[in-house]
Amino acid sequence: MESTDAKKLEKPEWSDKAKDKDGQPIIATATASFEISKLCNPTKILLEKGVRYHLEIDAPPNSWSDGGFQVPVGGFSANQPPIWYHRILLGLGVPLRRELTQDWFRIVLRYGRVGGEEVFLDPDPEDSKIEANIRPTRDGELFIFVNDAVIGVPGLYDFFYRNNGGGGKLTLTRKY
């Protein structure tokens, strides 16, 4: 993953929610949209090491798909397994899965430079909104993607992502 132009990241577009007595933001938010058909979605949001963030991911229920098969928002889980014939196809693709130990279509956040830190978000089977708290251990741009198969051949890296449909909106709240 390549970082977005650094000049765009110098001042993320945080919207102030409240200020302390010195006029410093206490809570600020930033948003970004993402598509699950992209190998990686840069957000242009720069995270700071050690700062606490709360994030929410919203996507319309039943809006994600993989080659025509419906996928739960946030990926499959033991509570929401794929239908049996889709499970067979996904089983054949496990050796190509981007993150072998994570479920298919699990949302992954990556920050830092190339090969940075990753956080995997667990879906809520009752709600299409996913929430989590993070505290990065390094500075860097926030990227978001889903866990699907990849091919290590130039031009084909995103082959299995191309048939995915849907996306969502990430809202990140910075807490001072």
Where are these regions (language model features)?
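Gly-Asp-aromatic-enriched flexible segments
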Residues: 1-176
